[in-house]
């Protein structure tokens, strides 16, 4: 069985981080759209149907944000696990493994527990958006 070398592992991690960042940029744009829509719902005193549609749109964005945060940790933990499988590694790689552990990444990652800070941040976003949609001015 042929294993990747240290450089290949770091390259794969960087590719994953770049992809994750691009995906998050799209989520950030859609989050801005959701806040604009929530503000519009409040300004127009919109009906229940419109508020429900904007709520569902916002929940989709929030789900994708949670998923992106979980994927980020999966990339980092997967990199640490791959580095730990090497026979020898640099001091920097060893420090990375020490920071993220040597457990294999979860196959069925939980978007709520993968990154508690990310989960808390998205909870605040959820309250902010739904507060704008469903409360009176």
Model-derived regions, located:
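Cytosolic-side membrane-entry/anchor segment at the start of a transmembrane helix
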Residues: 2-35
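Membrane-interface segments at the starts/ends of alpha-helical transmembrane spans
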Residues: 6-15, 100-114
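Hydrophobic alpha-helical transmembrane segments of multipass integral membrane proteins
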Residues: 23-30, 55-65, 119-126
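Transmembrane alpha-helical segments in integral membrane proteins
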Residues: 28-39, 111-137
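Juxtamembrane helix-break-helix junctions at the cytosolic face
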Residues: 36-44, 72
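Alpha-helical transmembrane segments and their helix-start/interface "positive-inside/aromatic belt" motifs
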Residues: 42-58
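Hydrophobic alpha-helical membrane-insertion segments
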Residues: 53-80
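Juxtamembrane non-transmembrane "cap" segments at the membrane-aqueous interface
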Residues: 71-99
